[in-house]
Amino acid sequence: MSVLQELTKKKYSSLKTMFDDKYCPTFVYSILDQTIPGAVYADDQTFPKSFFIGTESGIYFIAGDQGNRDFHDFIAGYYEEQVKSSKRFTLFSSSDTWDSVLKPILKDDLNQMRRAAFSYQPKSFKKTLQLPKGLVLKRIDEDIISHSTAFNSAYYEEYWNSVSQFASKGFGFAVLHGNHVVSECTSIFLGHNRAEMDIYTLEEYRGLGLAYCVANRFIAFCMENGIVPSWDCDICNNSSIALAAKLGFKTVTEYTIYYSG
């Protein structure tokens, strides 16, 4: 594997503004804010131009100068090591130019998916709809996590490193029917005053507007606390795109992810 340099954590904060004028997934800011564990590799410690940033759970982002051949070798080698150890490898590309570079490097080993990134339009915020009788909305805590089927302890261990880390730094809301968690909207990632939303509703409770209600509460919390809500999804996920539009999000860009499995 070609040797690139892992940047020291004291350099993380200075990198955040480098991604402000282009697409950058929220998990990158989570790493740079040191909200979750991760690593930043670059072609130079002092004046980095190419970046490979990843979570411990196997989600990565590549950005910067596409012409560095050593960087190409590093990506190929890193991917091969992940495959050998049967670890997750999900790579977010920052541009179409990077796509053209990555395809020959990764060959045909990985699946590809086009995704859309959305921007929230604050003026379009609407009041919460009334929940159906018998349902209540609460902020997610460790007790709710212990009763959840979708956003359970394994979920937070994967994306937040631990339930306690999420409880300390993250937030989310759930609709409950008794002790039954039926719909949730949580911050899968949080960084640089951005919170990426992840939503799930049990199949038997869909069609009741619960996802809209719980997402609306999530957005309201963001507005109250100076946080920008973030929404990304597969471009073929029509129900997610429709819900995003209803909540006040507009598509700003599309990008490609490469993933194993």
Swiss-Prot record:
GO terms for molecular function: acyltransferase activity, transferring groups other than amino-acyl groups. Residues 135-261 form the N-acetyltransferase domain. Its EC number is 2.3.1.-. Keywords: Acyltransferase, Transferase. InterPro entries: Acyl_CoA_acyltransferase, GNAT_acetyltra_YdfB-like, GNAT_dom. Gene3D superfamilies: 3.40.630.30. It is an enzyme of class 2 (transferase). Belongs to the acetyltransferase family. This is Uncharacterized N-acetyltransferase YdfB. It comes from Bacillus subtilis (strain 168). The lineage of its organism: Bacteria, Bacillati, Bacillota, Bacilli, Bacillales.
